[in-house]
A protein has these predicted regions:
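Rossmann-like adenosine-cofactor binding region
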Residues: 258-328, 334-335
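N-terminal ligand-binding/catalytic initiation module
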Residues: 24-181, 407-414
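Glycine-rich phosphate/diphosphate-binding loop of Rossmann-like nucleotide-binding domains
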Residues: 100, 105-125, 187, 191-284, ...
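Adenosine-phosphate binding glycine-rich loop
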Residues: 184-185, 308-416
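Solvent-exposed alpha-helices and their adjacent loops that cap or buttress functional pockets
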Residues: 38, 81-86, 122-123, 148-150, ...
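General beta-strand structural signal in soluble alpha/beta enzymes
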Residues: 131, 157-160, 181-184, 215, ...
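Short, Lys/Arg-enriched N-terminal segments with co-localized hydrophobic residues
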Residues: 13-26
């Protein structure tokens, strides 16, 4: 195998002794990752962009010269986007209540994930990012804290905040701030799922308006996927939670679930997930491990599309789904074909929003991201095992950024 120095630099292995690298190759990914984290002692760092080697350098970068930039911003706060790095800075903000499949592990324990996200922002979007882990579960306190710091940022990425609090936090911040705010667990997952579905439907020759879609999981991701697909033209959607099919009029539902209950399950089907799956064309799982049986897949329509996205263990093993007759399968894991991962979304999405000088990220920009991702797989390349570009395909991130920028300009969300 050719040794890729650039790849080693990206993941930090150039800091590790060759003997340690060899030892890592015998471990599983969790062991490898833990060992690497011990060696790295952090995945991001801050570096200066200007020289400070002489008295003149110091006088220009800092005192006394810097005061002139301060006065310019004092007279016009918008100039903070021109005279500082604010314009290109996007924090990854969490309270640590819904981290990966680990749940409520606390803000400090979520820090490795947030650092990793910051690495991806820089690597694929050239966006300066850092973690902000808030030690509070109080919705109002979190909103207030973020608003107090917002003058330092060009955008905000919310991450791993539990449902339903995440809905109010994002909605309020979008209403009260004039920079892009994006909850990736909701919309990033929805965007990449739609991209995968756009290309999968080409292969099975079906229209989104004609198919029956079942979503298992009524948290942040499931509800966002549901609303996003409905907006894109889906007509027949059923969403399930742990108790079964969500139906309008159920008083036990939270506010967000009640909203989607009015938009879905038009035939008023009652029962469990197995009942919902009968005759379905598409299954999308954002729930928990092993919640789908072989029999459920067998009960689906011909040429079924199955996206079990739960991590690290999917709703059904892809091999089992294939045996049961699933025609196209996509998971959240890199171990299988068709990884449906929101890494394809957020770097390019924010790059496009920032480059357009957008004050928000609207639905049209998110749809543009989905269609941009889908377009990166050519007609000749498209197959049952290749419906999405790889997350590390830099051309895909550039395409997303350009598509989002054009949508922002077209829909008039540019700051005056």
């Amino acid at each position: 195998m050719v040794h890729d120095i650039h790849h080693d630099e990206l993941i930090g292995l150039h800091f590790i002794h060759p003997n340690v690298i060899k030892e890592l190759s015998t471990m599983n990914y969790k062991e490898k990752s833990l060992q690497a984290h011990k060696e790295w002692r952090g995945k991001i760092e801050m570096k200066p962009r200007v020289p400070v080697e002489t008295r003149e350098d110091l006088s220009i970068a800092y005192t006394p010269g810097v005061s002139q930039a301060c006065l310019e911003i004092k007279d016009d706060v918008k100039k903070s986007f021109e005279l500082t790095r604010r314009w290109n800075t996007v924090p990854v903000i969490t309270d640590g209540t819904a981290v990966l499949g680990l749940g409520d592990i606390g803000p400090e324990a979520g820090l490795p994930v947030m650092e990793g996200k910051s690495v991806l922002f820089k690597t694929f979007g050239d966006i300066d990012s850092y973690p902000l882990c808030i030690r509070s579960k109080d919705t109002e306190e979190i909103i207030k804290t973020i608003k107090l710091f917002a003058g330092s940022w060009g955008g905000i990425n919310l991450e791993d905040i539990s449902s339903p609090r995440c809905f109010e936090i994002e909605t309020r911040l979008k209403e009260e701030l004039d920079i892009p705010v994006f909850h990736d667990d909701q919309h990033g997952t929805a965007i990449v799922t739609l991209a995968a579905l756009i290309n999968a439907l080409k292969l099975v020759d079906k229209k989104i308006s004609d198919i029956k879609i079942v979503i298992n999981g009524a948290g942040a991701a499931g509800i966002s996927i549901c609303k996003f697909l409905l907006n894109y033209g889906a007509k027949h959607v059923i969403i399930c939670d742990l108790k079964g099919i969500i139906c309008e009029g159920d008083d036990s539902l939270n506010t967000a679930q009640k909203e989607v209950s009015k938009l879905t399950n038009k035939e008023h089907v009652h029962g469990k997930l197995a009942d919902a799956m009968k005759g379905a064309d598409v299954f999308i799982g954002v729930s928990g491990p092993n919640s789908v049986s072989k029999e459920m897949i067998q009960s689906m329509n011909e040429k079924s599309i199955v996206f079990p996205l739960a991590n690290p263990v999917p709703e059904i093993n892809p091999e089992l789904a294939k045996e049961a007759g699933a025609y196209i399968i996509g998971t959240g894991s890199s171990e299988y074909a068709n990884q449906i991962n929101n890494v394809l979304v957020f770097p390019g999405l924010f790059r496009g929003a920032i480059d357009a000088n957008a004050r928000t990220i609207n639905t049209e920009m998110m749809v543009a991201a989905s269609e941009g991702i889908a377009s990166c797989v050519s007609k000749d390349e498209l197959s049952r095992e290749y419906i999405l570009p790889y997350p590390y395909d830099r051309k895909a991130h550039v395409c997303v950024a350009q598509s989002v920028k054009e949508a922002a300009i077209r829909t008039g969300v540019i700051k005056k």
